[in-house]
Amino acid sequence: MLCQRLTLAGSHLLKSGENMFQHKQVHELAELEAITTEVGRVYKTPDGAFPSITTILSRLSRDDINKWRKRVGEEKANKVSRTSSSRGTRIHKMCEDYINNKKPDIRSPLDKQMFMSMQEILDGFVGEVYGQELPLYSKHLGIAGRVDLICEWNGKLAIVDYKTSAKLKKREWVNSYFMQATAYCIMYEEMTGIPVDRFVILIGVDQEPPQTFYGKRNDNIADLIDAIKGYYDENNLIHSNPSLFDHSCS
């Protein structure tokens, strides 16, 4: 599992020419309705209602977040959370538009700095695009979610997940990101038959070059299954595939 802080020459909002990123229509996946319930965000799928992978993984950082909220106070914590969430949404949309060969809507200098640093990485590594913001689910895992990007990254098919941060991250701080991307790898293969065995976590960082973490699906499956089991147990839910929890997933 590697982390690289990458910069490439050039600063521009669009590459020259049209159809800069080539899109490959592999499978048309049906949209999934998402609802908010007492146990978090849930997607309605043809095989049942499954919790969002982000909801499942959020419980892993709950204690640390609660300690932070007590330390800084509810008012400041709410403000920081809103600001972070809004920025993340904006940066995700900019990256999505850019990969769709549209000019991103950039409304602040800080957003511009972060997006353009990530854009340089996208320019250098993204090849053929298999899909963006695809709704995914797995009956085997009993989860669902929406993946940011599936593409050829430096010539090999990969899941790409965008994140934003106010500061640089250490590898040990992003275990949940690795589990989330692993879940997308498994869900995509289950729905399409196309295996994806690697992923990229691209993190835009305030006033810093972006960070790029690389990982392999099979290195994170056991941790992912433990997280899913913890969520189902905590909420007294019945899993559609109980045998999953003997770590038989491969």
Roles of regions detected by a PLM:
Residues 130, 134-237:
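Mg2+/Mn2+-dependent nuclease catalytic core
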Residues 2-144:
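Metal-dependent nuclease catalytic cores that hydrolyze phosphodiester bonds in DNA/RNA
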Residues 107, 111, 148, 212-215, ...:
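Generic preference for flexible, low-structure residues
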Residues 4-24, 153-154, 158, 236-250:
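DEDD superfamily 3′-5′ metal-dependent exonuclease/proofreading module
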Residues 15, 19, 66, 78, ...:
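Detector for Asparagine
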